[in-house]
Amino acid sequence: MIDDSIVRGTQLRETTEFLYRNGAKEVHIRPACPPLLYGCKYLNFSRSKSEMDLITRRVIAKREGENVSDKVLADYADPNSANYKEMLEEIRKELNFTSLKFHRLDDLKASIGISPCKLCTYCWDGKE
């Protein structure tokens, strides 16, 4: 199943439960964007009021505590890091997905065709 993003995880958790109740054997999730690690400072695209509403931040808080440095968050944003892979596995388990794979931010930037200096990526990497 493809969705635009996973913010809190509520909607996909409910959809996944519905699919399993109605006979699905597996549920594979492919969000259209990288994991959201920061709440948007610029647009009100979500009902989330706190970064702790984000499923990524809740998983990180379970692993690291709530006060996490920017350096640690950058490691979780790096799709080549062990922390990133473990975060995805925790999200997959928590939401009962068979598999979960996100787009990489570097691939997303390349595919858009806009100069990276004109593209806001704050919610994914915390960079303004």
Q: Model regions: which residues?
A:
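PRPP-associated nucleotide enzymes
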Residues: 1-128
